[in-house]
Design a protein with these regions (language model features):
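N-terminal periplasmic "start-of-domain" segments of outer-membrane beta-barrel proteins
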Residues: 23-54, 83
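N-terminal periplasmic accessory domains that precede
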Residues: 61-65, 80-85, 96-97, 112-117, ...
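Short acidic/polar hinge/loop motifs at secondary-structure boundaries
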Residues: 74, 101-128
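Periplasmic-side early beta-strands and strand-to-turn transitions of outer-membrane beta-barrels
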Residues: 133, 145, 152-154, 162, ...
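Face-selective signature of the C-terminal outer-membrane beta-barrel domain
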Residues: 185, 220-237, 249-378, 434, ...
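Outer-membrane beta-barrel signature, preferentially recognizing the C-terminal barrel domain
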Residues: 246-262, 288-292, 385, 392-450, ...
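Surface-exposed extracellular loop regions of Gram-negative outer-membrane beta-barrel proteins
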Residues: 274, 362-364, 368, 377-428, ...
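Gram-negative outer-membrane beta-barrel transporters
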Residues: 345-352, 446-449, 468-551, 592-595
Length: 619
């Protein structure tokens, strides 16, 4: 895995080429809960910057992560709901955060990825490996933290529109303001995608049409140099046309308030996520799912000059879930935690970061202490960085897994299990990075041990599927990446990852990891004259074949083995800036015109070559 946050050029006409060294020296990350330059963080962190996002041509987080990281693949689960696999871990082990906050709502252990609007994003931080000592439950395999952009001085407005294949339409607006005391950012976005009919046979014949609204506002008032108050609010709505008779609707309302005074920060967050069934003939809708979360976070950080930073804090979370999958309607639970961390500069070129966290969950009576230890050594002239990380992961069984009682259309039942144990994991990774001027090389080896994995299997005694603790899982691999920037505006980087999974006997490989994956990206930028900049990007990805298990809907007690073929994808994007703040963009997807011979649930949802055109204006 590369530690670089994407090189090449920034997206303003005045900027020149950014080298890997410039990126490490300027990008600030929060992977250790305390802001640090990317080059100084002991935790192996991948950063996707706003410039990377604009050059990617991808309007959503799923497409962005698949393009930028070889070990990430999104597939379709039951009822065409997307599910992630990131280096051997599914949605239950990857924690998605929005500005460091958890999100309510899930389907098949995955959040609603359409909520993760990329319109006003400064960067995406990805930590691969266990991170429960910092972020608690669900971070057994990694964390994806989406950080919103901060307003620049003055008043700014940006409008954008995109049209593409399969009736793709996107419209966005962003308005921001900042002075010495007040900062505010308001963004709104509408996305629509028509139905996609697939030209060949498969596990499904079409992808449902969908459209969504996403509105967010964030305001900060600076009371003094070391004191401020921030308020935020968000609204989200999405409809999926899953049949001619009824549609699926999803809605979310979120809000938060945080205060900072010197070294103390306090936050309150509210998030309610709903699911509805909408009847086309009558125009009526019925809510059959609600997840409401209220949380409070308090954190104290004190910096000891030239020595290190001490951080301590705690969280309270009230989690309420009403679901059609429950026999009794609703359940709730409380989660309490406390954490400590010492970010220590042990020597001139040595950083050591130990951490400890305790979590307690009321519903399952689960509790866990999660330790971590991260070390960074930069020997010699500082061109080489050696990192060693150990972290424990932890995932308490959620309310659905504990209490589910769902009749699957009269075919079979899916039952929860109040006796479930918590998932635990141990992650060890070692990395070496060489960086000099305009080139870099990184190699990382990782090893994960996961105990008591939670999933459902057929239980003969109750003649249904039931959530159970599975056998131990081993996930081992190597990640190699290289990057080179050239003075004429070209940056090339490539990454290869090998992942090996070892399942316990009899465990279902429902979402297997492809053992080999490669990404190659080339960025070119040229400033013709003031305000006239051409940017071109090529993204190539190859994924190897993999064998998994498929459970039949009508015979869930029997699973068949299925081999999924290898495939490769190539995408091209071009953008040209013009005076007066206009930018024209063109994206071509699947240039190689790959069409699956059979559409499996983890096949790319493509019908061949496609593309989009976009236009934006900013003031």
């Amino acid at each position: 895995m590369t530690l670089m946050a994407g090189s090449g050029v920034a997206d303003t006409a005045a900027d020149l080429v950014v080298s890997p060294l410039d990126t490490l020296e300027t990008v600030v990350v929060t992977a250790t809960r305390t802001p640090k330059l990317l080059k100084d963080t002991p935790v192996v962190t991948r950063v996707v910057t706003s410039a990377d996002i604009s050059r990617s041509g991808k309007p959503d987080i799923a497409g962005l992560l698949e393009q930028q990281m070889p070990g990430v693949e999104f597939s379709l689960g039951m009822a065409q709901n997307p599910q992630i696999n990131m280096s051997g871990f599914g949605g239950g082990g990857i924690l998605f955060l929005l500005d460091g906050e958890r999100m309510a709502g899930e389907t098949l252990d995955n959040p609603d990825y359409s909520r993760l609007n990329l319109q006003n994003v400064d960067r995406v931080e990805i930590v691969k490996g266990a991170a429960s000592s910092l972020y608690g439950s669900n971070a057994t395999g990694g964390v994806v933290n989406i950080i919103s952009g901060s307003p620049k001085e003055g008043t700014h407005v940006k409008l954008n529109a995109r049209y593409g294949s399969h009736q793709l339409q996107s419209y966005g607006a962003l308005a921001s303001y900042r002075n010495k005391r007040i900062a505010n950012s308001l963004d709104a976005r509408f996305d629509s995608q028509g139905e996609i009919r697939f030209p060949r046979l498969g596990d499904f014949s079409r992808a449902f049409a969908t459209h969504s609204w996403n509105v967010r506002d964030r305001a900060t008032v600076t009371l003094a140099e070391d004191a401020s108050i921030t308020a935020r609010a968000g609204y989200y709505w999405r409809q999926r046309n899953s049949s001619n008779v009824s549609y699926e609707r999803y809605g979310d309302l979120s809000a938060g308030l945080s205060a900072r005074w010197k070294e103390l920060t306090a936050k309150y967050s509210f998030d309610t996520y709903d699911k509805y069934d909408y009847e086309v003939a009558t125009g009526e809708q019925a809510r059959d799912y609600r997840n409401r979360q209220n949380s409070v976070n308090v954190q104290y950080s004190h910096e000891f000059r030239d020595v290190g930073t001490f951080t301590a804090g705690g969280d309270w979370l009230d989690d309420y879930l009403m679901s059609y999958e429950f026999d009794s309607g609703s359940y709730s639970q409380t989660n309490l935690d406390a954490f400590l961390q010492w970010d220590w500069k042990a020597a001139d070129k040595v950083w050591i970061v130990p951490g400890l966290r305790y979590d307690w969950f009321s519903a399952s009576r689960a509790n866990r202490v999660s330790p971590k230890l991260s070390m960074l050594w930069r020997p010699g002239k500082g061109n080489c960085s050696l990192r060693l990380n150990y972290a424990a992961g932890f995932r308490a069984p959620n309310l659905k897994e504990l209490y589910m009682d769902f009749d699957m259309a009269g075919i079979f039942h899916i039952f929860g299990n109040p006796d479930l144990k918590s998932e635990t994991s141990h992650n060890l990774n070692v990395s070496a990075e060489y960086l000099k001027g305009n080139r870099s090389f990184t190699v990382m080896a990782f090893h994960n041990i996961v105990d008591n994995r939670i999933s459902y299997l057929w239980n003969e005694s109750i003649e249904g599927l039931q959530y159970l603790n599975l056998h131990r899982l081993f996930v081992t691999g190597v990640d190699v990446s290289a990057m080179r920037s050239f003075p004429f505006g070209l940056t090339v980087n490539g990454e290869y990852i090998y992942t090996h999974e070892k399942y316990g006997k009899g465990d279902l490989r429902a979402n297997p990891t492809r053992p080999h994956a490669v990404t190659v990206k080339a960025d070119y930028s040229h400033l013709w004259m003031t305000d006239w900049r051409l940017t071109a990007t090529a993204n190539f990805k190859w994924l190897s074949a993999v064998t998994g298990d498929v459970m039949s809907l009508f015979s869930p007690e029997a699973a068949r083995t299925q081999r999924y073929p290898a495939y490769s994808m190539l995408g091209l994007t071009l953008s040209q800036t013009f005076p007066k703040g206009f930018t024209l963009g063109v994206a071509v997807d699947n240039v190689l015109n790959y069409i699956p011979s059979y559409y499996y649930y983890n096949s790319p949802l493509t019908t061949g070559i496609g593309g989009s055109i976009s236009l934006s204006w900013q003031m």
